[in-house]
Design a protein with these regions (language model features):
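Active-site-proximal or metal-binding-adjacent scaffold patches in catalytic folds
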Residues: 1-171, 180-223
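Walker B catalytic acidic pair
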Residues: 176
């Protein structure tokens, strides 16, 4: 796959030059710009022509990220912000609002373990979706999606899922488990999801909001 050539643009902008028919503009969750354009395309003019749209998009992202503003240096876990403190072992103290860990790698390992155990339990609780499922569960650090289901029936979950409130974690598991029966996003798939999580449209909107918050969080960016 041709990934194109990257070049530096103005501050907060990445330009990717590749053989495409038309330019594409993306405002990332952190507010920076990514432009994919043909080799000789006038990127600066393109950005200027879309300045109003860019500012509107940035305002939308700022609104979505409002809950995390001023708490970017705290760990978002189970929908709550915790102060990270050094400790000989991993420990969550809800009363004090702290999470102790000896290192970032240790923190990542323990969060991964927590999520994997929770996913296993949730799959056991919905046998009509998982059925006689014999695939594997993997927890990974991903930058584009909350989870995925392979054609072999293996379920992959983004470590970021553990940052979500409990109802949204449930929804992500239901969503991916439904793919064990429907490997698409067809009407049948959404009907199946709705049988187990009726308010899935609201959940999708909340997932978008939390994605922006996590993208702007310095602790999560270390994983």
């Amino acid at each position: 796959m041709d990934r194109g050539e990257k070049e530096r643009g103005a501050a907060g902008m990445t330009i990717v030059r590749k053989a495409v028919r038309s330019a594409r503009l993306q405002v990332r969750p952190d507010g920076s710009l990514r432009v994919v354009a043909p080799p000789s395309f006038d990127v600066e003019g393109f950005v200027q022509r879309n300045a109003a749209w860019i500012e509107e998009r940035r305002r939308d992202l700022d609104r979505l990220a409002a809950e995390g503003r001023g708490r970017e240096g705290m760990l978002l876990l189970s929908g709550r912000f915790y102060h990270l403190v050094p400790g000989a072992r991993f420990a969550v103290d809800d009363a004090r609002g702290t999470v102790a860990s000896p290192s970032v790698p240790a923190l990542q390992r323990n969060l991964s373990r927590m999520l994997k155990e929770e996913v296993s339990g949730r799959l056991e609780a919905c046998p009509d979706l998982a059925g006689r499922w014999s695939g594997r569960i993997a927890v990974k650090v991903q930058r584009t999606r909350w989870g995925s289901c392979s054609t072999l029936g293996n379920l992959n979950f983004n470590l970021r899922v553990i940052a979500l409130p409990e109802p949204l974690r449930e929804y992500v598991v239901v969503h991916e488990a439904a793919h064990l029966r429907e490997l698409n996003h067809s009407e049948r798939f959404w009907r199946l999801v709705g049988e187990h999580y009726p308010d899935h449209r609201a959940a999708e909107a909340e997932l978008r909001r939390y994605w922006v918050i996590i993208e702007r969080n310095r602790v999560w960016s270390e994983f």
